[in-house]
A protein has these predicted regions:
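PAPS-dependent sulfotransferase catalytic domain
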Residues: 1-196, 242-260, 264-292
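PAPS/PAP-binding and catalytic site of the sulfotransferase fold
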Residues: 52-66, 196-220, 228, 236
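An amphipathic alpha-helix signature
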Residues: 140-143, 206-213, 222-225, 271, ...
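Catalytic lobes of large eukaryotic enzymes
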Residues: 214-255
């Protein structure tokens, strides 16, 4: 896509204020974000695509149900347990997604891949009691996972080498990885935020569930924590997702769910290029990733 108009080169993509977006995001939703109202009891998950957003949201859903923060009465009757998103199209063609979200019952669990600069003010600079969980994953595994996902979805027709270069240069969906993670990382000391890393969750799932529960002020028994850990293992969620007939791409969300899968795809040259970009962008920021 280098040197060419993104919409001419990849017709399912479009550029908005210098960032590449998939067509399903829709410009109307992005235009509406500065005025979108965030409620005090909203729980928001922010993360670059393929960072573990859905996995994190499943944990949150289960924690909130176990703590009695969501009940049958507060579940969305149109899609109980569904993960709502700012930046994705919905089946109802009569409403853009921000209008759809405005009518959803509280508490809402909303996921977004948006950079901080594109997010609603109530997420980018939160006040009140809104809870925001930022999920991050190392850029190499993120790129490999995104390649396989977008290829299965039919959005990507490039080979791995071309895709890896586009990802590294921020010429793929949602733009530059580092611009995204560092924008949210600036808020690491804000009490409205909890930051989680995919690799840490893989190493200590129980600890991740307990962190989420504490952050959401959800008092859980040990047995409830153990049940959530078992329910939200990659193995169990993959079975659910693979059989899903849900809207969109849920059935291809889960693939391997491991850390270090980048080694199966990266050439030495690609590895060196990704390492150089990593050091250039993260040196001195305090943000580090594990690659194993």
């Amino acid at each position: 896509m280098a040197g060419k108009d993104v919409e001419e080169e990849e017709p399912w993509l479009f550029e908005y204020k210098g960032t590449v977006f998939p067509g399903c995001t829709r410009k109307e939703n992005l235009d509406a974000m500065p005025d979108f109202h965030i409620r005090d009891d909203d729980v928001i998950v922010v993360g670059f695509p393929k960072a573990g957003n859905h996995w994190c949201a499943e944990i949150i859903n289960n924690v909130m149900r176990a703590a009695g923060k969501t009940t049958e009465a507060t579940m969305d009757p149109e899609a109980p347990g569904r993960i709502l998103e700012f930046d994705d199209e919905i089946a109802d063609e009569t409403r853009t997604n921000h209008r759809f979200l405005e009518g959803k019952p509280s508490p809402r669990l909303i996921c977004t891949h948006l950079h901080r600069e594109f997010a609603p003010p109530g997420v980018a600079s939160p006040t009140g009691n809104t809870k925001i969980i930022s999920i991050m994953r190392n850029p190499k595994d993120t790129a490999v996972s995104y390649y396989h996902f977008s290829t299965k979805l039919g959005d990507n027709e490039d080979d791995w080498g071309t895709f890896a270069d586009n990802f590294l240069q921020g010429r793929w969906e949602y733009g530059d990885f580092y611009r995204h993670v560092l924008g949210w990382w600036e808020l690491r000391d804000d009490p409205h935020f909890l930051f989680l890393k995919y690799e840490d969750m893989k190493k200590d799932m129980k600890g991740a569930v307990e962190k989420v529960a504490t952050f959401l002020e959800a008092e859980l028994e040990e047995a409830q924590v153990a049940s959530i850990v078992e329910t939200c293992t990659f193995r169990n969620l993959k079975v659910v997702y693979d059989k899903s007939a849900d809207i969109g791409c849920r059935s291809i969300i889960a693939r391997k769910g491991i850390a270090g899968d980048w080694k199966s795809m990266f050439t030495d040259e690609q590895n060196a290029a990704f390492d150089a970009k990593y050091e250039e962008n993260l040196e001195g920021t305090g943000l580090k990733f594990d690659f194993e």
